[in-house]
């Protein structure tokens, strides 16, 4: 049961590319003015390949390994334009935890808590994180960004940006001073076992078909400890549409959530 509680938190906080025990240092005093948040976002877009490269693709698949507290398994992350996602973590001897968004319905399944249709802030976050061209088009979710300090994350100098969403949530993103790329985030997610403030760290960017992709994702939270996702496969434009279909276990629950669903087509 404890294992699946941790997996519930992992699944709830995953859908990005985030607490106690995070490697953040105290803010570093600046001798110069902080760059505007919009400029940091623009620099990130260029640093990962540019708008044209991002918009040249319509889907992506990542595959690799997952490790947490002596437990290991496999992970696959599927995403597609304009806003679809599916994440599945399989652990031998325990089973598979899955989460998805088909452009309208957000859902997750695990062996302990069963199938669930997402609503409210959980659905809003999943919609935002499923935006395939993120950060392009993020204005539909974000009402403001502000650079608040120069600090450190994962032994890197980063600019800390406070983000406010249209549903009045505030969270932080961190942009690498040297490379310009997104280095991580801190955000609170709602899980089946309560809220979890989660630090996400992005490492090991590699160029794939003109786009730079982080191949290592580290997540830390007080509730779930540390999880490390290492991807060995990254490919664009090879994902079948059927991957994003709502599972049979979820369909009976969809009627109760349709009033909060939104289409991105």
Describe the role of every protein-language-model region.
Residues 248-265:
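Gram-negative outer-membrane assembly/targeting C-terminal domains
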Residues 154-250:
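Gly/Pro-enriched, hydrophobic low-complexity segments
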Residues 107-133:
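Acidic/charged, solvent-exposed loop-and-adjacent secondary-structure segments enriched in E/D, K/R, S/T
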Residues 34-38:
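Soluble non-cytosolic domains of exported or imported proteins
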Residues 125-160, 181-186:
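Short, conserved active-site entrance elements at the starts or edges of catalytic domains
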Residues 14-28:
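C-terminal segment of classical bacterial N-terminal signal peptides
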Residues 39-114, 141-152, 265:
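N-terminal mature ectodomain segment of secretory-pathway/periplasmic proteins
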Residues 1-6:
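N-terminal secretory signal peptides that target proteins for export/translocation
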């Amino acid at each position: 049961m404890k294992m699946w509680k941790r997996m519930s938190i992992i699944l709830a906080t995953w859908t990005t590319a985030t607490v106690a025990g995070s490697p953040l240092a105290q803010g570093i005093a600046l001798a110069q003015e902080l760059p505007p948040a919009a400029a940091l976002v623009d620099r990130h877009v260029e640093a990962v390949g540019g708008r044209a490269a991002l918009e040249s693709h319509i889907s992506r698949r990542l595959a690799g390994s997952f490790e947490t507290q002596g437990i290991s398994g496999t992970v696959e992350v599927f995403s597609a334009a304009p806003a679809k996602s599916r994440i599945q973590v399989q652990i031998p001897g325990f089973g598979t935890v899955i989460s998805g968004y088909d452009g309208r319905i957000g859902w997750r399944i695990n062996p302990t808590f069963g199938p669930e249709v997402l609503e409210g802030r959980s659905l809003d976050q999943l919609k935002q994180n499923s935006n395939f061209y993120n950060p392009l088009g993020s204005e539909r979710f974000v009402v403001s960004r502000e650079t608040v300090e120069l600090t450190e994350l994962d032994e890197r100098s980063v600019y800390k940006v406070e983000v406010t969403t249209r549903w009045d949530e505030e969270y932080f993103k961190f942009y690498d001073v040297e490379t310009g790329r997104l280095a991580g985030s801190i955000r609170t997610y709602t899980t089946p076992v309560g809220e979890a403030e989660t630090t996400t760290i992005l490492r090991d960017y590699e160029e794939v078909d003109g786009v730079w992709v982080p191949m290592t994702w580290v997540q830390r939270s007080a509730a779930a400890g540390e999880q490390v996702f290492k991807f060995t496969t990254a490919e664009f434009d090879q994902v079948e549409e059927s991957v994003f279909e709502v599972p049979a276990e979820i369909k009976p629950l969809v009627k109760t959530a349709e009033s909060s669903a939104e289409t991105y087509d």
